[in-house]
Structures are given as C-alpha cells and as structure tokens.
Amino acid sequence: MSSPAFRFRLATLDDAPALLSIYAPYVEKAAISFEYDVPSLDEFRRRIADISRKYPYLVAEDENGQLLGYAYTHTFIAREAYDHCAESTIYLALDARKHGLGKRFYRAIEELSLAQNIYNLYACIGEPQGADDEYLTDNSIRFHEHMGFRRIGVFTRSGYKFGRWYNMSWAEKLLMEHPEHPEPVIPFPQLDKALVADILRRSAE
C-alpha cells in the first residue's frame, strides 16, 4: 500500500498560527462558526492546551509539512454524568475539502474516543436559511448524516450572525452498545502512545 498524501499527528502550541489561519475564514465569511471575531493567537493557543488535557486534538499534515485541517473532541456538558459523551469539531483548509479528509478525521476521532471509554459523539451544526444562503450550506449536515450521525434536535433561531437568525441542529452518533457498568473515561494523554500512533496511522490511509 502506498503512503498516504498526509499524516495525522497531535497538535502542538506551535501549530496555533497555521490552525488559526484555517479557522479564520469560517468566522469572518461564514456562519459555520458562531463566533463574531477571530480569536487572538494567545487565545487559540489556550484553547489547544485546554482541550488537549483530556481529549485528542489532531492535525492533518501533507508531505510538505503544510497543515490541511484539524479536529478534536471536547466536553459535551460539564457534569460528571455526561463524561462518556463528547462533542466533535472539524475544520479543514478551504482547498483541502472534498478529498475525504473529514471522513478520515472522524475515523480517528471515533476510535480514539472508544479507547477513552467515550460512547456518544455529538455535533452542533448550523442550518442554512434556504438554498441561497451565501454564508452557510447544508454540506455539514449531509456529511454528518453520511458518517452515521442522526439529527436529534434543533435549537430554533438560536444563533444570530450576518444580520439573520440561524437554527442550530444537534446530531448524535452512538459508537457502541453502552455497557451496564462503564469503565471511567481515560484522559487522552494517559492512552498508550503506541495505540494512539497506530490509530492515527491507520486512519490516514
């Protein structure tokens, strides 16, 4: 089997400038992110560090070292009973879309989540205001359906951006049958490093 055109690895704080440049268009020119302002570099570094304390924060890197996108899981709701759930986030460079990268990111995220004893993944997805919405399409909704997520609810007109209201759709994917007595969630940094490396390698193929 030939080597993949990119590899997955864990994000570092040094990746923050490149990742912020990937994220910025989704803030400034789209309603995919509901942030109004692009966060500062220091704030973005803080987010990477905070998420990485418990969850995987992944980047995709091509053969030239250019970052193509990033993905992570993070806290769903900050109460102990929700610990076996996580919310997923993926952002791709604009020219890296439509090449199967998002699907491979989810392949990695799902397997790493199971290794952590996380069984439910949730995605929070903005809904476009009709087919002619220049700030948002239904691509993310259709992508998550393709990945096995099921739409379970909608927050009606809960987001206001670019002078219009947006619905926020929630989608869910159950990764396995829930055990009657689940093992505690394992913080991502405590996972076996060889296992993580193997998952990242296989997911990029």
Language model features: what each stretch is:
Residues S113-L136:
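Conserved GNAT acetyl-CoA-binding A-motif
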Residues R157-E205:
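C-terminal "cap" of GNAT-fold acetyltransferases
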